Amino acid sequence: MENIKRYFKNLTETQISQFEALDALYRDWNEKINVISRKDIDNLYEHHILHSLAIAKIIEFTPGSKILDVGTGGGFPGIPLAILFPECEFLLVDRTGKKIKVAEDISNQIGLKNVSLRQCGVEEEKGLFDFVVSRAAMPMNELFRISRKNVAKQQQNALPNGIIALKGGDLTAEAA
């Protein structure tokens, strides 16, 4: 949590309390279903929340922006971004019902009013969004192929509308 405060110095008290609440909520859910690797739950803030917030270091979404989180799993990167950008609208989608249930419960418990959730693949989502975000949900070429239809043409942010994917590991095969 301290790293979040260090990198994001202008958090409100509400945002701080929302971020602080995530640890207990994810631990509780992780005891019921495997939301985050059991070996990695102690690194929740650095490996999952702060990683999700890396997007905010390249763009500060304009109030009113609409963001689609594809393959959200337990709510990453959507929930941390929704905390940071309370004046933006977030739709979190995932095929797995139990993961959507986790993300919905957590977003409700911390009082997020700017998050909607839907159990579906992005192929089924017809809405238009300023940005599509994703965190290690699928190969880039597949993400681009199935979600580019969801990127709105009308611009309202400093960066052009598009797809922002957080990836890790060896991306050689995806870059080819």
Residue ranges: model-predicted function:
Residues 68-70, 164:
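Conserved beta-strand elements of the Class I
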Residues 87-176:
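S-adenosylmethionine
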